[in-house]
Amino acid sequence: MDLQHQTFHNKGCDIHYWHKSSSSADYVIFLHGAGCDHRMFASQLPIFGESYNVLLWDARGHGLSKLQHNQTFSFEDMIDDFLKLCEKYQIANAILIGQSMGGNLAQEILFRKPNLVSKLILIDCTRNTGKLTLSEKLMLKLSKPIFYCYPWQTLIRQSAEACGNDEAVKAYVRNCLAQMKKKDFIDVMMSLMTCLREDEAYRFPKPVLLLCGEDDRSGNIRKIVAPWADSDANCTLLMIEKAGHNANQDNPTAVNKAIASFLTTP
């Protein structure tokens, strides 16, 4: 796929993104997970051929979209980046495909701008509006000091092990994280908590495909995904065999088949 590498500046950060135009007005926008970059969706691009305009990015603080020395990652700034990108291309309706952090961002965009989204595909991400147990709330409060206790190389290695089953996926994650500073990674993880709000009455107003690796060991994702799907008539769940947290990389064949089928569903 012929992707054009471009940048735009917003809130002190040069955001790098990749764009492919088509004759269609339909857009699909890929949103990667924390610590990763746009390359994690390489195996999904062939699904879309010439039928869609495609956008991928390196979210601020990730990949080529480096933060300035005195900057701190903010989930709210990332939302603003996304909306600026949509404004730049006058996007009025898009399919969002988000993995982990990207899925949290996609949920928040649908919550705030429902008319901007036609469908969501959420890969191995937690529920923004889910109810947390007391132990989960405690772990969130303790996570920052725990992260800082870990040597950076140990944190990189353990994060990579949690993300993938396939050795190539683990190597990719290690490569991405090695380009970040420990403080920046921790800032990203802590900022993600700002999108969590308990609202058990909330239901998605658009069709949503939930994909989860059967071996996902990250947070509470595997535990909550089935009840999440059961509670929302707009959700369709598929567990992905032989896949960890980065299910779209561990088992792209199964993920691509599920996405292609979902795209044709009214």
Residue ranges and their predicted role:
Residues L209-A243:
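Conserved loop-alpha-helix segment in the C-terminal half of the alpha/beta-hydrolase fold
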Residues K131-T133, C149-R203:
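Conserved alpha/beta-hydrolase catalytic His-Asp/Glu region
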Residues M1-I29, S51-Y52, A92, A260-P266:
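Alpha/beta-hydrolase fold catalytic core
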Residues Q107-F111, S118-F147:
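Flexible "cap/lid" loop of the alpha/beta hydrolase fold
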Residues A243-P252, N256:
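Catalytic histidine-centered segment of alpha/beta-hydrolase-like enzymes
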Residues L55-I97, K257:
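Active-site loop/oxyanion-hole signature of alpha/beta-hydrolase fold enzymes
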Residues G98, G102, A106:
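Gly/Ala-rich beta-loop-alpha elbow adjacent to hydrolase catalytic centers
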Residues C13-L67:
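Conserved HGGG/HGGXW glycine-rich cap/lid loop of the alpha/beta-hydrolase fold
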